Amino acid sequence: YLLGSPFFWITTILPRSWMLYALPVLLSVKHGIAAMTAYAYIQRFVRSRNAALIGGLLYAFSGFQLFNLFFNHFQDVTAFFPLMLIAMEESINQNRKGVFALAVALMGCINYFFFTGQAVFLVLYFIVRCFSKDFHATPKKFFRLALEAIIGVLLACFLLLPSALAILANNRITSRLYGMDMLAYNDRTRIWRIIESFF
């Protein structure tokens, strides 16, 4: 699950007795990288560097980030996610070839579980950005972007494929949901907890 995370590999070289002290430092580094990559993404759309800085800090220290501190691998994904958005913008607006494939491969390696959600988000992001005047998408660029996405997934297959096979071998995936569990959470407080995490 963590084999593609660069932060995980840092923890493997540290002595076990240091882990208690290393985790807060690593979380700080992850939040710093998240702020930096979000800043790099946001600065493309605002005039003021201060606005980009505030946006980067809001991203890095959002309710989602802080609520999920106890899952230290969540921050691995959010630290590098803006790179996918930057790569898409570069591919479409600057005709940079290969950058999107590398970003897709990186995110596919970091965490396969979050990668599926990121893929859905990027499709929605592309659709929404097509309505913007500063997004110069053409059918040719779209197909090149789709090809780069496929290449990125293929590059990440050395981690994605074993992970998929392990998940498919799990006997719990054959279980089914019945009744209201198919439509809604059975815990009545979960929705409120999700909304609460936004603040």
Regions found by a protein language model. Give the residues of each.
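Periplasmic/ER-lumenal interhelical loops and adjacent helix-loop junctions
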Residues: 6, 141-142, 149-199
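Short hydrophobic/aromatic helix or loop-helix immediately within or flanking a transmembrane segment
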Residues: 1-17
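Alpha-helical structural elements of signaling/regulatory helical domains
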Residues: 17-20, 93-94
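Membrane-embedded helix bundles of polyisoprenyl
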Residues: 27-28, 32-45, 49-131, 144-164, ...
